[in-house]
């Protein structure tokens, strides 16, 4: 019986899902990714080949009809009644990252985190985990040229965090350096 059931948004080809599914407690699998969403058909095809037991949606998270996901979650909860549900989102980071340099940001892409509230309301997860670059915390308004407005630095992020808390969640964050976990990069 699984202790954690994961829904993986922005699942890509499945790196996070592989990590979740290989988690062990006392030698037994303790977590399972049960559903995945990604807009890229090639990524979903790769993910499905590696994780055939998960339900896959090739769709933008903003437009996905959530009732099939909710129904699937209900079935999985029936099989694992004591399991906690985790909503995992590896939000698109390009339009927050320093790696974008001085290029204009895509305002629509920067609002993807706001669309998570639909999922929170529909599936009522026990936990929410977000993975992104540290610049996500500087999320604010953009000017007419698509450049971040320095006086608004972090305001949209703080508003978003406060909205997460309104659903009754505690909120903590950590900045991790990939190099500290064996990766050949110092990406945070």
What is the predicted function of each stretch?
Residues 45-81:
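S-adenosyl-L-methionine
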Residues 33-34:
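Short beta-strand element of Class I
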Residues 2-6:
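Extreme N-terminal starter segment of soluble prokaryotic enzymes
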Residues 67, 72-81, 93-188:
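Class I S-adenosyl-L-methionine
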Residues 40:
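Conserved SAM/SAH-binding beta-strand->alpha-helix loop
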Residues 9-14, 91:
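Class I SAM-dependent methyltransferase "Motif I" SAM/SAH-binding loop
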């Amino acid at each position: 019986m699984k202790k954690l059931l994961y829904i993986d948004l922005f699942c890509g080809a499945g790196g996070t899902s592989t990590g979740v599914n290989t988690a062990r407690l006392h030698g037994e699998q303790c977590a399972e990714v049960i559903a995945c969403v990604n807009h890229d058909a090639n990524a979903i095809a790769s993910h499905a080949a590696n994780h055939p037991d998960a339900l896959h949606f090739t769709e933008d998270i903003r437009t996905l009809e959530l009732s099939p996901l909710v129904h699937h979650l209900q079935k999985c909860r029936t099989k694992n009644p004591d399991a906690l549900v985790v909503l995992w989102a590896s939000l698109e980071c390009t339009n927050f990252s320093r790696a974008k340099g001085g290029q204009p940001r895509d305002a629509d892409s920067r609002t993807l985190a706001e669309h998570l509230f639909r999922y929170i309301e529909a599936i009522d997860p026990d936990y929410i985990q977000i993975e992104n670059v540290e610049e996500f915390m500087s999320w604010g308004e953009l000017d007419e040229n698509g450049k971040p407005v320095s006086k608004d630095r972090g305001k949209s992020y703080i508003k978003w965090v406060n909205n997460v808390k309104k659903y009754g969640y505690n909120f903590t964050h950590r900045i991790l350096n990939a190099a500290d976990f064996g990766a050949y990069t110092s990406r945070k």
